[in-house]
Amino acid sequence: MTMESARSYDVLVLGGGNAALCAALTAREIGRSVLMLEWAPKHSRGGNSRHVRNLRCMHDAPADVLTDSYPEEEYWQDLLKVTGGQTSEELARMTIRATADCRGWMIRHGARFQPALGGTLHVSRTNAFFLGGGKALLNAYYRSAEALGVEIRYDCEVVDLAIDDGRFTSATVIEEGERREIRAKTVVAAAGGFESNLAWLKEAWGPVADNFLIRGTPYNMGRVLRVLIDRGAKSIGDPKQGHSVAIDARAPKFDGGICTRVDCVSLGIVVNADAQRFYDEGEDFWPKRYAIWGRLVAGQPDQIGYSIIDVKSMGRFMPPVFPPVKANSIPELAKALGLDPAALEATVSSFNRAVRPGNFDHTVLDDCGTEGLAPPKTHWARTIDTPPYFAYPLRPGITFTYLGVTVNAKAQVIMNDGKPAPNIFAAGEIMAGNVLGKGYLAGIGMSIGTTFGRIAGEQAARHAAH
């Protein structure tokens, strides 16, 4: 039996992370009644936003924590390159432009920024870092939402949406063990992708998905996404595409967060279970390439890789939470990793012979490359010959998936007939595939969530007023 809520709301926000909060705050600022539903318990609220560190920002001149400039066209070209053109230029440029002035709004709701830390992907020019990280940002937003009168319910799972001819009327939720119906004039879907749904990942990837680790929340099961698609929303994106990085293989199955990411890939070599290299570790700056390495490792035998460096590279990257495997020789390192010692020694020797002299500088695209080696290492190639040697085991770490719902510039969900749903809006991961067809840029997930959260909140509030 489904119990009907006695109250109807102007704006119903599904989700509890950055995009959901931006929508709820914006709608409430306009004066609409807002109910936000978070499936997670209060101590785990916030989705993947708990693990974020920064926001990628367009700016034409130095501004507080941002150095130099990062103009719109450069931002756009960076995005175009990593996505291979699989992006909506209209929505992407809208996102980029919105980042130029969103920080003032964020600060009004309690966000605090700090200069980039050493070793954080060389992004002090392009990214503004949150003081205290994502959890501090979320706590500030929740405080602001509560002060403004946003109603928030935790442990509340959305299991269905009533949508008739593209128009939303109510949501069915499970709360305190009971099915309840909640009515609202508008709805904002900001409940994340399906990255926590192991069965759905396996449906897309096959058996290899068994070896994937989920970097963030276990609550992003894709329930709202699935319901929207089943109710006629037009999908966008490939279910096999997403923000996927190489993380320490010793990380937990869920919620390891950013501290499990391995950032020394571009400083050394990466080998697979056969002790063979399989990709150019120095192709481009790490912020533009770190998010392809999860997918690369996923394509290797047993979905495992090993990032190998020598002592020369220590101290040049932000160390992950787990200590590296350490050895005084390459064969000894191979044994510790369970690799064939002769094979690893041959791979390292071959790499060392191919390294050409240059001026090593990890802050620029330097001239330290290899010659006659397949795959090559284009930049930052230095011989691995100074003990002790170190290694980090790698697994694919899924951050979020790109399969989502299609939206327009008003954040309205587009239905299969090509028409926008008049009162259904989407923000964050659930629609990020409109901007990210593949690839990733550090901090752009927060740019998308913040931009479309605010747009969705404003548009939902204005629709509810009529």
Residues of each region from the PLM?
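A conserved short coil-to-beta-strand element within the FAD-binding core of flavoproteins
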Residues: 154-167
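Glycine-rich loop(s) and the adjacent beta-strand/alpha-helix scaffold that form part
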Residues: 178, 182-251, 446, 455
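An anion/pyrophosphate-binding glycine-rich loop and adjacent beta-alpha core
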Residues: 221, 225-343
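Beta1/beta-strand and adjacent pyrophosphate-binding region of the FAD-binding site
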Residues: 5-19, 35
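Conserved N-terminal/central alpha/beta ligand/cofactor-binding core
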Residues: 33, 39-151, 268-277, 282-283, ...
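Core beta-strand elements of the Rossmann-like FAD/NAD(P) dinucleotide-binding domain
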Residues: 6-9, 176-186, 420
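A glycine-rich dinucleotide-binding beta-alpha-beta segment and adjacent secondary-structure elements
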Residues: 160, 343-434, 438
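Helix-rich C-terminal "cap"/substrate-channel and partner-interaction subdomain
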Residues: 297-388, 459, 463
